[in-house]
Amino acid sequence: MTVNDPSVIAELSELAERYETALMANDLPTLDGMFWQSPHVVRLGIGENLYGIESIAAFRAARPGGSPPRRVLRMTISSFGHDLGVINVEFQRIGAAVIGRQSQSWVRFAEGWRIVAAHVSLMGGGH
């Protein structure tokens, strides 16, 4: 197995940038489309545990104004083979001292890369 193949890392880097742009713009069609369209996809958030794409899409649609603005402090990307990648982001919400973390597991399907599992948390229990 090839770990951290440069071409796969480049693809995942582009996806990470696209995701961050969509998140900050509250571009729901793009965000929803980046997740695996399955009842088996999982997103564990700061105040919610979401199972299945319908739950994830409903959460995003009901969130007024989308995700709070943030800046990325650090990002790491790893790939395992050509069809599995992990993106971890350390972020800080604008105007807040608390540090947040985001982890995404990406799998390449026939239709392209999709997030199959995601986790978002804040350090220190703050919101």
Region spans (language model):
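Short, hydrophobic secondary-structure boundary micro-motifs
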Residues: 31-33, 43-44, 71-72, 116-117
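Structural motif
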Residues: 37, 80-81, 109
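Short beta-strand segments enriched in hydrophobic/aromatic residues
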Residues: 35-36, 91-93, 119-122
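Short, low-complexity N-terminal intrinsically disordered segments enriched in polar/charged residues
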Residues: 1-37, 49, 125-127
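Hydrophobic pocket/interface hotspot
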Residues: 19, 31-32, 52, 56, ...
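Surface-exposed, charged secondary-structure patches
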Residues: 4, 11-14, 42, 46, ...
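Short beta-strand edge/turn micro-motifs at domain boundaries
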Residues: 86, 99-127
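Conserved GNAT-family N-acetyltransferase fold
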Residues: 39, 89, 104
